[in-house]
Amino acid sequence: MRPEVANATNANDTFLNCSSLTSLAGEVGACKSYTQELGFDYEVVHSIIIVVVPLFFGIIGILGFAGNLLVVVVVAANPGMRSTTNILIINLAVADLLFVIFCIPFTATDFVLPYWPFGNVWCKTVQYLIIVTAYASVYTLVLMSLDRYLAVVHPIASMSWRTENHAIQAICIMWALILAVSMPAIIIHGEVTYVFQKPNGQSENLTVCRFLNEQYNWTVFQMTFFLTSYVLPLVLICIFYMSMLISLWRSARDSAESRRGRRRATRLVFVVVGVFAVCWCPIQVILVTKSLEVFPLTTAMIMVQIVSHVLAYTNSCINPFLYAFLSDHFRKAFRKIIYCRPRAEVNNRLGPPTKTTRATNSGNNL
């Protein structure tokens, strides 16, 4: 498909036709020559972007790659940490790794440059991967919450369900559905070349990667994405947690150690979910208001959007730090890997994955 060519008599045309998750970059860059028509100071915004975006996105990229890779290595290398919850944690780390590798570098470039330099195919690919990884992350959290719900509310009945094989099968089904459902993102995003007419009669062409809203309804897309990638999963998670917390704190038939194990695992998942909700809330709200064309284009609000992007992307690197802070097993395993301790010593410290322990405490082995 050839990129679109659109005429724009002023920069606000570009602002009303932005992409889904990387819109600010194209907007600011495409408006460079038309500052007088905007409600914000382009020079101030641009000077902040070229410093803040490379710095913070670079830090997020490095920490996200190293931290999530460390999570995968730690769980894979330590049989004592194999559990349904930790398999789901690996999947969450993989989703964050994909986002860090394939989305953050190109989004950062799109912020800094006034045009999209990677071509139409990669424009569609990056937008598709952003949607896929966003869905993969949040619905992995739903699976983690479901796993905790079964472990707490139905600890005996769910023993045959909460196995590593079933967790892997659930993850595969989830990825297959997400990859299929997200396919429209490839169609509705693409390159658009704006032809700006300058006051002196000359024209300036700027190619950006964005939502093709001349053909498709961006409001419908953004509202659908907001509901299915944020509201719906968080509602499901809240239902699971309300049920399990009532059961957890009222339970008296299990041993104190068993209850403590479930509470530790449940607390970890709860914190990870809470951090996700906080990190993604601002940018989700901003994108919805922009799709409804009620987002004020002022210098202050654009700064808010930049901070919101940084906050959302920070979520891709923060989970390993949460595991290290909240889980003794993860903290010890991280130290052993970082300080290159022998694998046998790591496994001895973490404890053997005995059949009895795995059968009764699957998912609590954090």
Labelled PLM ranges:
Residues 275-281, 285-288, 304-354:
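Seventh transmembrane helix
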Residues 199-218, 226-229, 246-285:
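Intracellular effector-coupling site of seven-transmembrane GPCRs
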Residues 57, 98-114, 127, 134-141, ...:
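Helix-to-loop junction signature of class
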Residues 32-44, 111, 115-131, 154, ...:
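Loop architecture of class A 7-transmembrane GPCRs
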Residues 49-78, 98, 238, 242:
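First transmembrane helix
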